[in-house]
């Protein structure tokens, strides 16, 4: 499976409240940017766990703490998903 995570411009952002989990509830208006995206490829494998590989621009986070692996761990915990290879083609600059 290959997904395109489109870039978007935040036109408005309102922080509503801080939640008990430390995150915030937000209200936002975003505008998609055509043709600028990160590409995420997920392939099932026979090996347990997740293999992660990033290509393109630098991924600015600690190893094992990127959002792709966090999503995998949630799917693993809640749905028993196991054995995947994840490739992130990073085209959108971090924080953009």
Where are these regions (language model features)?
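ATP-binding N-lobe of GHMP and related small-molecule kinases
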Residues: 1-94
């Amino acid at each position: 499976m290959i997904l395109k995570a489109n870039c978007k411009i935040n036109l408005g952002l309102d922080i509503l409240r801080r939640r008990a989990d430390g995150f915030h509830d937000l209200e936002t208006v975003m505008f998609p940017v055509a043709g600028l995206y990160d590409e995420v490829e997920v392939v099932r494998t026979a090996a347990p766990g997740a293999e992660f590989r990033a290509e393109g621009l630098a991924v600015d986070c600690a190893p094992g703490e990127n959002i792709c692996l966090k999503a995998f761990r949630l799917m693993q915990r809640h749905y028993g998903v196991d054995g995947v290879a994840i490739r992130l083609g990073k085209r959108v600059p971090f924080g953009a």
